[in-house]
C-alpha cells in the first residue's frame, strides 16, 4: 500500500467507486439504528420489484457493545459503509475486490477470504445468504444476498455489501486501536469520539431510566401502528427504528429477561412486517415508478389478471 488513507479519504474513495457503478450516494438516515441494513434505503428498497442502487455511510449504535472508550475495538457507535444493489450485478464480488484495490489493497498480495456466514435479523424478519470477508485474518466486510426482508421474499435478488469502516481503517493505517485512526490529517478518531463513547456507555449501562424506556417502547409501538392505519409507511418505520433502539438500551441495561427479550423482538418484527407489506402496496398504487415502462406494464398486467 503506497499511501495510508485517512478515515474520510476511505469514505470518499468508496463513494467515488460506487458512484461509478451507478449507485445513488445517499446520506446517513437521521434515526438511531443498530446497522445500515435498518435504514429505509436498504430495508424498504430491498423489497418490491423496483431497481435500487445506493451507497451511504451509516453510523450504527449498539449500546451493549459500549466499553467506556477503554476497548480498542468494541464501540457503542461504529460506522458502516453500506452498498445495496437490486438487481444484484452478476459481478458484484469482483466489483467489491476492485473497490479494495482503489483503497490500495491488492487482492493478489493479501489473503482475502469469503467465509460463509448466513445472515439473519430476527427483529426485522430478514435473512439472506452471506459471507464474512476476511482480510489477512481480520473481518472487514459482510456480504449478503437478501432472501427475505420484513418477512417478504425478495425479488429481484438484492445484494448488500457492508464495510466496517473502523476495521478497514485500522488495517490500512496499521494501528491497533480505533482511537489512533487518523480521521483527517492531524485529527485522530479518539479526539472526536472517545468522550461520546464514554458518556453513551455510562448512560446505557448505569444512568438510563428503565421505566421511561419501557413506557417509550409501548408509546413508539402504538404510534407506529397508528401511522400504519393511515397508510404512512415512512413515519411508521421511524417508530419501528425507535422501538429497536429503545429495546437495545433496555437490553444493555439488563432490564429485560430472556423470555421478555423474545417478546420484544417479536413485537418489533411484527411491526416491521406490516411496514414492509404496506410499502410494497403503496409503491404499487404509484405504479412502481422506478421500473422501466415495459416491465411496469407487464407486471401490473399480471397483477390485474
From Swiss-Prot:
Sorted keywords for this record are: Aminoacyl-tRNA synthetase, ATP-binding, Cytoplasm, Ligase, Nucleotide-binding, Protein biosynthesis
**Which SUPFAM superfamilies would you find in this protein's record?**
Class II aaRS and biotin synthetases
| Primary localization class, coarse | cytoplasm
Positions of transmembrane segments = none
Under the heading Pfam families, the entry gives:
tRNA-synt_2e
| GO molecular function (one) | transferase activity
Q: Where in the cell is it found?
A: Cytoplasm
Q: List the catalytic activities from the record.
A: tRNA(Gly) + glycine + ATP = glycyl-tRNA(Gly) + AMP + diphosphate
EC?
6.1.1.14
InterPro entries assigned to the protein according to its UniProt record, in alphabetical order = aa-tRNA-synth_II/BPL/LPL, Gly-tRNA-synth_heterodimer, Gly-tRNA_ligase_asu
Q: Which GO terms describe its cellular component?
A: cytosol
One GO-annotated biological process of the protein: glycyl-tRNA aminoacylation
Gene3D superfamilies referenced in this protein's UniProt entry, alphabetically: Bira Bifunctional Protein, Domain 2 (3.30.930.10), Class II aaRS and biotin synthetases, domain 2 (1.20.58.180)
The annotated subunit structure for this chain is: Tetramer of two alpha and two beta subunits.
Listed NCBIfam families: glyQ (TIGR00388), PRK09348.1 (NF006827)
Family of the protein in this entry: Belongs to the class-II aminoacyl-tRNA synthetase family.
Protein name per UniProt: Glycine--tRNA ligase alpha subunit
Question: Which lineage ranks, top first, belong to the organism behind this chain?
Answer: Bacteria, Bacillati, Bacillota, Bacilli, Lactobacillales
- Which gene is annotated as encoding this protein in its UniProt record? glyQ
Amino acid at each position: 500500500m503506497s499511501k495510508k488513507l485517512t478515515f474520510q479519504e476511505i469514505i470518499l474513495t468508496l463513494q467515488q467507486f460506487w458512484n461509478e457503478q451507478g449507485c445513488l450516494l445517499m446520506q446517513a438516515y437521521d434515526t438511531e439504528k443498530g446497522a445500515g441494513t435498518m435504514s429505509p434505503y436498504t430495508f424498504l428498497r430491498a423489497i418490491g420489484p423496483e431497481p435500487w442502487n445506493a451507497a451511504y455511510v451509516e453510523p450504527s449504535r449498539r449500546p451493549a457493545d459500549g466499553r467506556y472508550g477503554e476497548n480498542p475495538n468494541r464501540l457503542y457507535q461504529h460506522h458502516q459503509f453500506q452498498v445495496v444493489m437490486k438487481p444484484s450485478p452478476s459481478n458484484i464480488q469482483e466489483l467489491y475486490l476492485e473497490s479494495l484495490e482503489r483503497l490500495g489493497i491488492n487482492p493478489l498480495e493479501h489473503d482475502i477470504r469469503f467465509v460463509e456466514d448466513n445472515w439473519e435479523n430476527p427483529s426485522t424478519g430478514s435473512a439472506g445468504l452471506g459471507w464474512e470477508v476476511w482480510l489477512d485474518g481480520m473481518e472487514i466486510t459482510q456480504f449478503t444476498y437478501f432472501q427475505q426482508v420484513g418477512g417478504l421474499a425478495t425479488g429481484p435478488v438484492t445484494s448488500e455489501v457492508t464495510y466496517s469502516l473502523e476495521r478497514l481503517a485500522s488495517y490500512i493505517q496499521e494501528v491497533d486501536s480505533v482511537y489512533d485512526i487518523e480521521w483527517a490529517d492531524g485529527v485522530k478518531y479518539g479526539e472526536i469520539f472517545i468522550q461520546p463513547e464514554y458518556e453513551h456507555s455510562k448512560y446505557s449501562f448505569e444512568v438510563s431510566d428503565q421505566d421511561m424506556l419501557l413506557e417509550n417502547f409501548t408509546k413508539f409501538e402504538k404510534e407506529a401502528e397508528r401511522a400504519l392505519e393511515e397508510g404512512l409507511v415512512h413515519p411508521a418505520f421511524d417508530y419501528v427504528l425507535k422501538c429497536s433502539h429503545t429495546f437495545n438500551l433496555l437490553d444493555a441495561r439488563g432490564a429485560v429477561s430472556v423470555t421478555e427479550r423474545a417478546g420484544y423482538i417479536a413485537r418489533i418484527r411484527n411491526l416491521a412486517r406490516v411496514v414492509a407489506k404496506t410499502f410494497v402496496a403503496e409503491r404499487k398504487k404509484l405504479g412502481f415508478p422506478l421500473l422501466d415502462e415495459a416491465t411496469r406494464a407487464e407486471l401490473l398486467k399480471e397483477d390485474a389478471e
